[in-house]
Amino acid sequence: MENNYTNNDTETLEEEMFASLEKYFQSQIEKHVINVKVLMKQRVGVAEHPDIMLTIEGELEKIASYSDKVDALELIS
C-alpha cells in the first residue's frame, strides 16, 4: 500500500501544502453553499436556528471568509 503522506518526486512539500489548503478551503465553500441551498429550499426553521435569515447570513459570511482565503493563497503561491 502506498503511503500518501510521503512527498513524490515531482511535487515539493510547499506545493503539496498549497494544494492541500486550496482543497480544504474549496471544500468548506462547497459545504456552506450546500447549507444555504438547503436552508433556502426547506424554508423551515430548525430549533437551534429560529432566525433563518440570520443563519443564512452566517453561512454567507463563512463562504466569503473561505473565498478570501483562496484569493490570499493565490497571491502568495
Where is each model-derived feature located?
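Extended, charge-rich alpha-helical interface modules
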Residues: 2-77
